[in-house]
Amino acid sequence: MMASTTSATAAGGAFAAAKTRAGSSAAGGGACARVAAGGRRRSGVVVRCDAGVEAQAQAQAVAKAASVAALEQFKISADRYMKERSSIAVIGLSVHTAPVEMREKLAVAEELWPRAISELTSLNHIEEAAVLSTCNRMEIYVVALSWNRGIREVVDWMSKKSGIPASELREHLFMLRDSDATRHLFEVSAGLDSLVLGEGQILAQVKQVVRSGQNSGGLGKNIDRMFKDAITAGKRVRCETNISSGAVSVSSAAVELALMKLPKSECLSARMLLIGAGKMGKLVVKHLIAKGCKKVVVVNRSVERVDAIREEMKDIEIVYRPLTEMYEAAAEADVVFTSTASETPLFTKEHAEALPAISDAMGGVRLFVDISVPRNVSACVSEVGHARVYNVDDLKEVVEANKEDRLRKAMEAQTIITQELKRFEAWRDSLETVPTIKKLRSYADRIRASELEKCLQKIGEDSLTKKMRRSIEELSTGIVNKLLHGPLQHLRCDGSDSRTLDETLENMHALNRMFSLDTEKAIIEQKIKAKVEKSQN
């Protein structure tokens, strides 16, 4: 995929539109269509950051109609194993492709990531897996032994978990494969695919995926390396482009939105309530301070986290209220920020109706700003006359500020992304020949051991001392190593010589043919067979 420049808003329902006009672009069977230089594709959508709004809309419409989405393509692909190595893929949805109502049904709490990874890697065609679930996205990264079968299994897993029919999910899911999947992760880590372009919290979330995956054992060598390289890319982009300067985060956008909805004359006197003292909640307090707020009430399950925030932030009065007093605290607040991991709503229409009215000076409306996924505040709360609800999908009007400057920096960031992508691809390409190297060594060693045994029998082992036997074994090993040195040198693909990847792969295939070595395709099929047998036991 060519260099991309900004996070694109993928159009829901792209699959249906693509079916009728995508025949020519789908030819060739590639999972991901190429896009024009300076563009970016997500579910068949390309956006250029150097184009105007009208040009962007036109580009989106053309790309959507001209591309068969990967999820549609995998359904019509030949249902057999065609690749010689496993495929890396990402499948998921984000704020760009799906509403919060759908994202919250698929959200996976951080403490459940290891369990999700274990379930995914137990699928017949999934070798490695990682889950990245935040308020703005739910993405599953996998190494699939068969990419079309593996993706089908992942979609079925997502459908079963969320209760959403697979056909409905496909209207909002995107899927990327191999280098496109890797580039996407690098862009996510760099903040280029965020609702808030350049925001920094996503990098910490990518780091947490690595820590969580290492504990569960699901991050095999491919995904582990890919995520670590994504962290490197994210750090480089922030250091070398300064893209985060002036950027807003979800928490700061939430504060900004609340202040936009309050009467200007009453912004600083509004009574602020925060429910949840986690990372996002802490950032809400930080940005309230930056806006001049002098007091905030914090409701949390335990007082320890609130004390830690109070100790760190001396410029604001923080009042702690236990969770049992949440509704009493809400009755005394003009603005309620919610940021908890609760999977059920904390506030329903009935709760909001029971709260007292707000003074006319504050606009007569209590504001609920919900930055949790799953949502902490039911959408029907807005049906109450003196209440309004805003969730993460409502932050878009805030993040437009300073966007043009960050888009220019995003273009600079693509150079770094491409450099890190090439490094990862070179590393992965170097693994291509590893199975052949192992099989060739094993083949040669079997012959060596067999011929050595014949030789020792002819000589008579009783007539040999231990030293003589060891010398003969070392001689046979040395001869094999010398003979293999040349062929194995021609299988190196680490950039240490002038050989291209194509030349190295030609050498690999030649050795496989000459020595009748098992192909990597056979190894993949053996892995699948082993997983199927294990699941049946």
UniProtKB/Swiss-Prot annotation:
NADP(+) binds at residues 276-281. SUPFAM superfamilies: Glutamyl tRNA-reductase catalytic, N-terminal domain, Glutamyl tRNA-reductase dimerization domain, NAD(P)-binding Rossmann-fold domains. Its main location: plastid. Pfam families: GlutR_dimer (PF00745), GlutR_N (PF05201), Shikimate_DH (PF01488). The keyword Membrane does not apply. Substrate binds at residues 134-137, 194, 199-201, 205. One of its GO terms (cellular component) is chloroplast. Its EC number is 1.2.1.70. This is Glutamyl-tRNA reductase, chloroplastic. It comes from Oryza sativa subsp. indica.
